[in-house]
Amino acid sequence: MDQTYMKEKPVVPLLLSMGIPVIISMIAGALYNIVDSIFVAMISEDAMTAGSLVYPIQNLAHAAGVGFGVGINAMVAGRLGEGKTRMANQTASQGVFLSALHGMILTILGMAVIPYFLRMFTSDEVTISYGLTYFCNVFLFSTIDTMGMAYEKVYQSVGKMKISMAAVLIGCGVNIVLDPIFIFGLGPMPELGIRGAAWATGIGQTASLLFYLILNHVKPLNVEISLREMRPSKEICGGMYSVGIAATLNMALTSLLLTALNAILAPFSQVYILVLGVYYKLQALLYQGASGVVQGMRPLIGYNYGAGEQERVKKIFRAAFMIVGIIMTAGTLLGELVPDFLMGLFTQTPSTVEIGRTALRLISPGFVMSTVSVIASGAFEGLGMGLKSLKISLMRYAVIIIPIAFVLSRIIGPTGVWHAFWLAELITAVYAGASWKRTITVSL
């Protein structure tokens, strides 16, 4: 199929056609996480706390899969823009192979690390038991998950956003249906508790990958994924890793941040860890929507930059900025206006809801501020400038927020951690805006 529509179709309709399917799929994934957490919370608050403690390691593994997928996406889209179809085929094939290898490595490392990781934050044996049970079961599916992410990014790189949306919806649908059946033992299924939540997740991931494999067999992509092209090439792998490692670190920084914040909050009470975990489930709904726009934007920027359409790259950036700004404004309003309702989805304990209300109202203004950073970071990835994207994420998730959270928590208590979010977003937005302005002046 001819990909020239990426540089010929009007920018806003094109971005929406690329972005909306991904937004739907990303929001569906975030909603699944929320629904899954609600079911887990029905087991007990200990189970919910265990999920919050496990989340950083789970997110780290997810970051490795998605981050490398971003490298695949950027390189395939760029080679297609340059008219190098054979190299695009090699990139896609080698990307799928390496993603499977990454999944195997993640399974081994995750199983080895998780017992020690959990004991860093709690000595409660019930919470530790819940965490180990969930983690060890869900990580059995890591290879399937990383391969599914690789196929998703290949399909997105050629503009097949509706296909990737369908795959995510299938996986989430299977997951949500199986969650109550496996967790609570409906019908002939025995009650599996938190183990059931893990197996529902893994089976959903398997369903998504099977959808891609069957579809690609029945109706092959114009980018060919084949065994004969899977032998790693230094040039191709280097290109994928140069973007993929930076993108992985971008997303893995969330795990670093959560681990650090859990350590800061743990001396006050485990309730604060639970609230932080709930916040991250809720904010995922917002940022996954924004990520959908970025994923629609990224191949468009990569293709048009490769095709020498610099002015069109700038137009795509502006359109994406406008859309994400609307999403983030909506998120800020929800956090300010209905925090009790949002917290009440996960717990009915009055003291926990009160702490969550304070957290959401203090953190929410940072959503609007983060628009600049989110779009600039994604645009840099699309241009193959992974290091610039990484610098922005380092500021958002480590260099600024962690020291501020630590210092403020010592001065005003755990509330200081919530203030650190919006302060970090404000400072990073100024830097990201200036960095993008310099880039378009020099490179575009």
State each model region's role.
Residues S17-D36, N137, G171, G204-S208, ...:
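Transmembrane helical elements of multi-pass membrane transporters/channels
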Residues A28, Y32, A61-G65, I105, ...:
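Residue-level hotspots within pore-lining transmembrane alpha-helices
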Residues I27, L31-T49, L118-E125, I181-L192, ...:
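Helix-terminus/linker motif at the lipid-water interface of multi-pass membrane proteins
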Residues G69, N73, V138-Q156, S164-C172, ...:
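Short runs within selected transmembrane alpha-helices of multi-pass transporters and secretion channels
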Residues E8, V12-L31, V35, I57-A64, ...:
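Residue-level signal for short hydrophobic patches within transmembrane helices
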Residues M48-I108, D145-G159, I163-S164, N262, ...:
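Small-residue-rich hydrophobic transmembrane alpha-helices
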